Regions:
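Major-groove recognition helix of helix-turn-helix-like DNA-binding domains
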Residues: 112-128
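Short amphipathic alpha-helical elements of helix-turn-helix/winged-helix folds
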Residues: 83-91, 102, 160
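Short acidic, hydrophobic short linear motifs in intrinsically disordered regions
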Residues: 93-115
């Protein structure tokens, strides 16, 4: 019973509880599988999207001021894009600054106390623009259309995430 005295009809998805499709079969959601395995499998699917590719400057940049060196992995851009798509799906509508904070870290300032810093907003913005061009995310506006609330995933991205999660879940069993 809610605080207003009537039963709530809102159904909350509980982690580990699978949904059923129209035929009564169990469906696996992207929330049901391990994030690490989902991002790795989703990274492999990112090859199908031509718009998601690292710019030429991506080999020389750090991912934030808290890093000492650029990423070592060859496919770090696609991995970050897959991870960012998952984060937009879970936390959306979400903006560039909040995503950059999620990819931030602790900056070593020598003898001074460490300090929390955000990740690169430029990398975050460019990846979100590429996800928009690929049709995986879109901007959500408020009811009057005057203010941007952040990015959300499209139905195509939702089905992609659930399809990849189904593959990951079947590989685990």
């Amino acid at each position: 019973m809610s605080k207003y005295g009537r039963l709530s009809t809102h159904r909350v998805h509980i982690h580990g509880e699978s949904r059923r499709d129209a035929f009564g079969d169990m469906m696996t959601s992207y929330r049901d599988v391990s994030p690490t395995e989902l991002v790795a499998a989703l990274r492999a699917e990112m090859d199908n999207f031509e718009k998601i590719s690292p710019p030429e400057w991506a080999v020389d940049v750090k991912t934030g001021t808290h890093r000492e060196m650029p990423p070592v992995q060859e496919d770090w851009w696609e991995t970050r894009a897959a991870s960012m798509l998952r984060k937009v799906a879970i936390h959306g509508p979400i903006g560039t600054n909040h995503l950059a904070q999620m990819y931030g870290g602790v900056k070593n300032r020598g003898v001074k106390p460490n300090k929390a810093v955000t990740g690169s907003r430029n990398i975050t913005r460019k990846i979100l623009q590429q996800l928009d061009e690929s049709g995986l995310t879109t901007l959500k506006m408020n009811a009057s259309g005057s203010k941007t609330l952040g990015r959300v995933i499209t139905p195509a991205a939702h089905s992609l995430l659930d399809r990849v999660a189904g593959k990951v879940a079947s590989a685990e069993m």
